[in-house]
Amino acid sequence: MKKSKIIILITLITLTFSACTKKESSKTTTPETKTTVEKNESVSTTWMDVTSIKSVYVDTGIFEHIGFAVPAANLPKENILAGVKYHGTSITLENESKPDTIMWPFSKGIKEEELEDFTSSKGVKIKVPVQSKLNFAPLDNTMKICRDNGLKMRGHVLVWHSQTPKTFFCEDYNASKGFVSAKEMDARQEWYIKSVFQHTKDWEAKNNNGNIIIYAWDIVNEAISDNASASAYLRDGSNWYAIYKNADFIVSAFQYANKYAPKEVLLAYNDYNEFQGEKHNGYLKIIDLILAEKNNPELPSRIDIAGMQSHNQTGWPSMIEYETCIKNFIAKGLDIHITELDITGSWKGGNNFNKADPEAQKRTYNQYFKLYQKYRKTENTNGITGITFWGITDENSWRGNASPLLFNHFEPKPAYYGVIEAAN
């Protein structure tokens, strides 16, 4: 009798323990299921379910690169990186390779003991920040991601009126002091350009068997005035212009870039509204000034690429005006990168634009990509070699309210199909 009671008691304990275990197991699986649902809801894969832009335009040999502008913090995100690799071959950092990021450690000033001697190619002796005062971490991290994922990169940008610390232009790197002379600024420019190219070359040598990751750089960006005239075409409100009063800083930048960049790295001038009247003529003058120093025996220049930003609208510019711009750049013996492509609706003033009508936007993208193919680079002619979209999805675009891109929340828009259909 006692034995039976013991058996019954053991059985009851076993059943109770089993029930508790199932109940506890049910509890622990609930958060896991919830996490999975949340992940699926937040990571849309719809842009991965359509034909890749790369397969249509790069794998077929039409262009060398299709690229996207991406903030450094977003690139490692699984859904973004996967889509960039699927649709493109190249990225451009929106901000992290600009001077204010790289010069950030001395943007508020620098101590005397953090300076070292530098002698320019023209024999000018100056003090410059030690290399440890340059912030290359975001650039290095991005090069590593590109290397690990088979991507290339456009460097953006070395010389620009914006996003460059004022300290870089001032005596003793002190923003409260006056500007340095053009002679000293020229030496500082050389030091900075040399530092960037030397760092990237060293990184690629150490971490990528010397193979190039950054295949092109925007050497000078947006130096032409929006109100350009035949006699005055340079942007005159910049610190660069305040010191030089002429285009010498543009030409010297391409001379120093040619001296320090690997020969396979393409050197570009980049601007917006590049097709427009006197601004376009100013662009052509800059190209001529750079080319004029091509055979300089002491410091030859080089320019390979005319960068057309192409922040355009569905009704502007006219296709004739845009095509003429392309033809004029090719006639200078340059290849072309479409560097920052997006298409909004009409302009409302300032940096405000109407939302693009979906069908008009699709039609415009379609017309552009037909035009780009018409003027693509061939064995015998210069031409367009790559197109970079300035962003991935509308909600993260700098002009997000105007819906300028091919994807919205990672879902393809009619504009995407306009791009794909242009190749068919």
Question: What is each stretch, according to the model?
Answer:
Residues 9-16:
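Bacterial N-terminal signal peptides
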Residues 64-70, 89-93, 153-157, 215-219, ...:
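Hydrophobic faces of well-ordered beta-strands that scaffold small-molecule active sites
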Residues 17-49:
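Bacterial Sec-dependent N-terminal signal peptides
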Residues 37-98:
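Boundary/entry segment of secreted carbohydrate-active catalytic domains
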Residues 103, 223-224, 228-243, 321-337, ...:
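Aromatic-rich peripheral "rim/lid" segments of glycoside hydrolase catalytic domains that contact
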Residues 56, 62-63, 69, 75-80, ...:
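Noncatalytic carbohydrate-binding groove/subsite architecture in carbohydrate-active enzymes
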Residues 90-268, 272-274, 343-351:
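Substrate-binding cleft and catalytic face of glycoside hydrolase catalytic domains
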Residues 50-54, 88, 139-146, 190-197, ...:
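Generic structural signal for well-ordered alpha-helices
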